[in-house]
Amino acid sequence: MQTIALVDDDRNILTSVSIALEAEGYKVETYTDGASALEGLLARPPQLAIFDIKMPRMDGMELLRRLRQKSDLPVIFLTSKDEEIDELFGLKMGADDFITKPFSQRLLVERVKAILRRAANREAAAGGTGPAKNADTPSRSLERGQLVMDQERHTCTWKNESVTLTVTEFLILHALAQRPGVVKSRDALMDAAYDEQVYVDDRTIDSHIKRLRKKFKMVDNDFDMIETLYGVGYRFRETA
């Protein structure tokens, strides 16, 4: 049984979301503040976590920041309509998705299923136990110049330096690096990283690209392999 961690100080949300997820066969562990959640997430890692942003003792952003130091666990944020900046900041920090309150339980469940499904597809493709989703589904290993991506171990290195990526970041980068010099539209990158049932807008892909660039510049300040073609999309530079 897959476990979902739910972190929110609103007990009504904890109750309603837990009921919806448990009805789909998931085990739900709940927390009412970020500090206790961090301890529990590291001690008993779930398959996915859902965070509220505004919480006592440690807010969702700080919780994500600390979690990302040790884990690439998929994370969905619950946000309010007036928290657009927080949404963008969360994506830049490595959140996989966000849902704006008020939301339907069905929408949340579908987002959870989609993220867990793409993670399972990635593992199946790595182990050769299932069909690839499409032509851009990562293979076991990819080498492009100084870039090495190992799908089975979910590792990425640049110039022999490790770069920690979330599931979404890994899939986006792989889609770009798989065909250097070929422009990938935002729609194509959405298809590579998200289930077709999940709606994401352009700013989500843009935020993930910015996050990727930032992570690579942390190990190589001269990193410039991801190019932007304004109005068209992105591409990974061809190596000599």
From Swiss-Prot:
Highest taxon of the lineage: Bacteria
Domain spans labelled Response regulatory: 3-116
Residues that bind Mg(2+): 8-9, 52
Gene Ontology CC annotation, any one: cytosol
Residue list for modification 4-aspartylphosphate: 52
DNA-binding region: 139-238
Biological process terms in GO annotation: polysaccharide biosynthetic process; positive regulation of DNA-templated transcription
Requisite cofactors: Mg(2+)
Cofactor remark from the record: Binds 1 Mg(2+) ion per subunit.
Keywords for this protein: Cytoplasm, DNA-binding, Exopolysaccharide synthesis, Magnesium, Metal-binding, Phosphoprotein, Transcription, Transcription regulation, Two-component regulatory system
Coiled-coil positions: none
SMART domains (alphabetical): REC, Trans_reg_C
Post-translational modification: Phosphorylated by ChvG.
Pathway the protein takes part in: Glycan metabolism; exopolysaccharide biosynthesis
SUPFAM superfamilies, sorted: C-terminal effector domain of the bipartite response regulators, CheY-like
Subcellular location: Cytoplasm
GO molecular function, one term: phosphorelay response regulator activity
Function: Member of a two-component regulatory system ChvG(ExoS)/ChvI involved in regulating the production of succinoglycan.
Annotated PANTHER family: DNA-BINDING DUAL MASTER TRANSCRIPTIONAL REGULATOR RPAA, REGULATOR OF RPOS
Name this protein carries in UniProt: Transcriptional regulatory protein ChvI
